[in-house]
Regions:
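Conserved phosphate- and dinucleotide-binding cores of soluble alpha/beta proteins
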Residues: 72-169
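N-terminal active-site beta-alpha-beta segment that forms phosphate/nucleotide-binding
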Residues: 1-102
């Protein structure tokens, strides 16, 4: 049902929502203080934050995920080094890897988010595994989605990682 609502959003509504999400993230004290921020490269049904990512990269070290088998690792963002990778997502090819302990803030996509920070992903567990690792638990997690993806409650399992903040527009 959430995905059907996303399909009803016009391109201009998606772009406006993404810019509002970016502005709210930019005002977050954790984001402001962070030197290294992990972000996602959006799929078609996720907020199109790519423009904001380019803007952030002028002031911060931005790292983006690359999926290798069952693992997700983060690498420096360089817009000239991106290529379609796993699941049709733009991924870095030749940039330096960023260890989890250097990431201070992570902007996380979601299929749905609950107001308490519970997150529903795409079901493969990449973000939960990465963020659940001992050396990644201190990362400040900002879950992002369109307003139509925000719900009151989501069922959770012990391995699910809760977001520290939810930004939905």
């Amino acid at each position: 049902m959430v995905r059907a609502q996303i399909r009803l959003l016009s391109p201009s509504e998606r772009t406006l929502a993404a810019e509002m999400i970016a502005q709210e993230v930019e005002c977050d004290p954790h984001f402001i203080a962070a030197k290294t921020v992990a972000v996602f490269m959006p799929l078609g049904d996720e907020p199109p934050i790519r423009e904001a990512v380019g803007r952030w990269a002028t002031e911060k070290r931005i790292v983006v995920p690359r999926v290798e088998g069952d693992d997700m690792r983060f690498f420096d963002f360089d817009s000239s080094d991106m290529a379609r990778g796993s699941f049709g997502i733009d991924e870095p090819q030749m940039t330096a890897e960023c260890p989890p302990e250097q990431i201070e803030v992570m902007i996380v996509p979601a299929v749905a988010l609950a107001r308490n920070g519970a997150r529903m992903g795409r079901g493969r567990g990449y973000y939960d595994r990465y963020l659940g690792a001992a050396n990644a638990t201190r990362i400040y997690k900002i879950g992002t989605c369109f307003a139509c993806q925000l719900v009151d409650e989501l069922p959770t399992e012990p391995h699910d990682v809760v977001m520290d903040r939810v930004v939905a527009r």
